[in-house]
Amino acid sequence: PEKVVPYALNYGIKASKGDVIMRLDGHCVYPNNYISVLVNYLFELSADNVGALWNTLPANDSLMANAIAIGSSHKFGVGGSLHKVGITQVTETDTVPFGCYRRDVFDRIGMFDTDLIRNQDDEFNARLINAGGKIVLIPEVVIDYTARDTISKMARMYYQYGLFKPLVNKKLGAPATIRQFFPLLFVLGILFGGLVSVFFPILWYAYVSVLFVYLLLSLYF
């Protein structure tokens, strides 16, 4: 039962002796200055956690892999996830990929939640902000992140993320972010909007208009 990410992270943190805790995950290639620049900004900005941008790359040359990479790095695909869509200025945010933390953060607010096989970083960063912490995204540092190459792999990954979102929100006592509800609301709107418009024809025009605008935006972006 302890062979999952949050347990491994906590064991590593407890065994650490330095002033900085840095998490590096797979599917990524890190620049040579990754550690030095982030550690410098961590103390220069008096931040509690800093992180880098993602440059999302396709896993192979297939059309699907390229489409997934594009969708995973565009506002139309991932909304306001700043580290995925990119920024040009050092920016305070609600989460960063992986993270470069001050060691004393874990003494102040505790370790990663071991109930969360997925999303443990989201819960931790939300807990950090709720405790008055400061999280900063650094555009000077860019990680090459390789996206999944098939829809089935993407679906499996996002299903796991979605599965643990309610538990994260329950532990926090409030939603970690508002944007997490947009996909759900959109899908429910598609499903129930069509059903409701059958009984209220006047709503049919609004329903079709929304779908048409969405289609145009999809083609544009």
Where in the sequence are the language-model features?
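Membrane-embedded multi-pass helical conduit in multi-pass membrane proteins
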Residues: F186-F221
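Conserved nucleotide-sugar donor-binding
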Residues: K17-G18, F98-I109
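Glycine-rich, basic loop-to-helix element that forms the pyrophosphate-binding segment
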Residues: P1-S16, V37
